[in-house]
Amino acid sequence: MYSMQLASCVTLTLVLLVNSAPTSSSTSSSTAEAQQQQQQQQQQQQHLEQLLMDLQELLSRMENYRNLKLPRMLTFKFYLPKQATELKDLQCLEDELGPLRHVLDLTQSKSFQLEDAENFISNIRVTVVKLKGSDNTFECQFDDESATVVDFLRRWIAFCQSIISTSPQ
């Protein structure tokens, strides 16, 4: 009688061990998924760094001491999100790229060349879409107070730096 119970127990144990052991296909698929996720994170990091560089370059050109039109540019107001903490908040940046391009068009002069203004805006737009996706259903909640173009760029630079510093390496 005990031998029958022992045989049943051993059989059940073996069945449990066989069914719970990972197979080579499930291990390789989870490894492939992990590698794909790591690649996506690396691409996201690269896109964030590119966006950061473009925004920093725009800001440095605007703050150039020879930019005589900066006081005029500072009269234009931009809107920032109430709290930007996620990539979907880049929709708010995308919404303000049109007005930013118009302000950058004012800077065209002999003393301050921003000859690539159109390219900067285009690059920023493409990078933003890559980061947040093409879905435009997210509605940005803008802050009540507006910001100057310099403050606008500084806040988005800080946003990029924050996301980069908190993303897994």
From Swiss-Prot:
Q: Where is the signal peptide?
A: 1-20
Induction details: By bacterial infection.
Glycosylation site list: 23
User: Which tissues does it occur in?
Assistant: Produced by immune cells including dendritic cells. In contrast, macrophages do not produce IL2 upon bacterial stimulation.
* Paired cysteines (S-S): 92-140
Which InterPro entries does the protein's record reference? 4_helix_cytokine-like_core, IL-2, IL-2_CS
Keyword Signal attached: yes
Q: Which molecular function term from Gene Ontology is one that the record holds?
A: cytokine activity
Protein name as annotated: Interleukin-2
Q: Please tell me the species this chain comes from.
A: Mus musculus (Mouse)
**Gene behind this protein:** Il2
